[in-house]
Amino acid sequence: MDVVEVAGSWWAQEREDIIMKYEKGHRAGLPEDKGPKPFRSYNNNVDHLGIVHETELPPLTAREAKQIRREISRKSKWVDMLGDWEKYKSSRKLIDRAYKGMPMNIRGPMWSVLLNIEEMKLKNPGRYQIMKEKGKRSSEHIQRIDRDISGTLRKHMFFRDRYGTKQRELLHILLAYEEYNPEVGYCRDLSHIAALFLLYLPEEDAFWALVQLLASERHSLQGFHSPNGGTVQGLQDQQEHVVATSQPKTMGHQDKKDLCGQCSPLGCLIRILIDGISLGLTLRLWDVYLVEGEQALMPITRIAFKVQQKRLTKTSRCGPWARFCNRFVDTWARDEDTVLKHLRASMKKLTRKQGDLPPPAKPEQGSSASRPVPASRGGKTLCKGDRQAPPGPPARFPRPIWSASPPRAPRSSTPCPGGAVREDTYPVGTQGVPSPALAQGGPQGSWRFLQWNSMPRLPTDLDVEGPWFRHYDFRQSCWVRAISQEDQLAPCWQAEHPAERVRSAFAAPSTDSDQGTPFRARDEQQCAPTSGPCLCGLHLESSQFPPGF
């Protein structure tokens, strides 16, 4: 037998041993895998959430007793909503009650309805069992799954027993999902999410809840776990805009210390929602997230920055986000109703300002292709040959963009000094209407603006190694051409034609006065050796040009 066959047989035997431990049941593993000894009597050691405590719990306080009575009174209202779901599924009353709190004995049926689990089971009869058996035979991550299960919700009475019933169900769900969605496969967060579903749902229902949570457009969690997902980048860009608007000092300090390129709190938001805070607050945040969708993530980020503003402005470059994650957990160490109250207020404020969701994702987001390097904060870059998106509703937060020239149609011919003929052009479909866009027909790479009387002056800080372009590799992909003789004569021609307020391009292609090489050819020669995105032939709209030009 060669090395490959030996390794394959060893791996198959290891997989069978792990599965056998779960099939045998409680305390079937090695001594080091047993973990804490289970409590057989849970009378006075378990709280209302199922968390097992080492010591006997004190009597209920007046506040806790009031909360229990309030939850019982709300149960009938939630039952009425479930009975008439078509009426309440898109109502404001459902959202209001979700922020106030979902009764524990209603949480399972409500999660099932919110994630449309019954419909998924009807469309895929018997598929879960098939995926589970395939996962047992061919899982490549079973060792990681087993290791993560051993540390998932171990203080809860359902998951306290090593290789117990709930841990076995959790193993089956994760193995089945690894086969069901090979793009995501398995990652550590999935064990915590599936465990939360298993607290209130049967095994198969919890599996389809996990499928819907990652696949549905409303929640879009697959972007956090898929290597090709675009959710993270869209939320990251939106977070930078929202925080820069609401907390300019905090974002300014991050820019000054060059902290923006490091880990973002959005990267740990999902972990914070499933681990690190009290189980009661975790469940209430998940209730809101399942009702509201991904737009609930941005208010959570905004609250975190607002609470931690003073600490963040004093944070140095040495491990800022590592300490931020720990302080973010401390932020929620307060009354649950207070946290949800602030979350609701933040949600309303961002919704009013249309900042609860990022702008629509671009086609390149969600693909493995490399993204162009931004020229500045909030600016997006297009490479040569890219086209702008067709006209549609404006983005919620329009940002300056580099764009290609729109198609042109000739308007008239005007004699120019030297016998040349100049054609005044307008964008196609806008004949007779002055446009601030660039007229086509001139040399590729020259920046011309129809509303300007003279050539624009390049800003003094427009340096590929200066603060305007923060990325050092930008100089490999951007080539700024010197102003040609034709551009220098343009103001003289405008002085001779005062009636013509619109800048336009010569019909004949310009050439370099020294070498006689067309600028298009020179652009191709300059861009050929580079590997980054090419910006030759692109222009910036005058209304989007940065201040200081």
Curated annotation (Swiss-Prot):
Region (Disordered): 350-443, 507-526
Cellular component GO terms, alphabetical: plasma membrane
Keywords, sorted A to Z: Cell membrane, GTPase activation, Lipoprotein, Membrane, Palmitate, Ubl conjugation
Domain of life (superkingdom): Eukaryota
Lipid-carrying residues in chain (S-palmitoyl cysteine): 318, 325
Pfam families referenced in this protein's UniProt entry, alphabetically: RabGAP-TBC (PF00566)
Miscellaneous section: TBC1D3 is encoded by a collection of very similar paralogs with multiple copies of each paralog, some human genomes encoding well over 50 copies depending on ethnic origin of the donor.
Protein name: TBC1 domain family member 3G
Native species: Homo sapiens (Human)
Lineage per the UniProt record: Eukaryota, Metazoa, Chordata, Craniata, Vertebrata
Gene that produces this protein: TBC1D3G
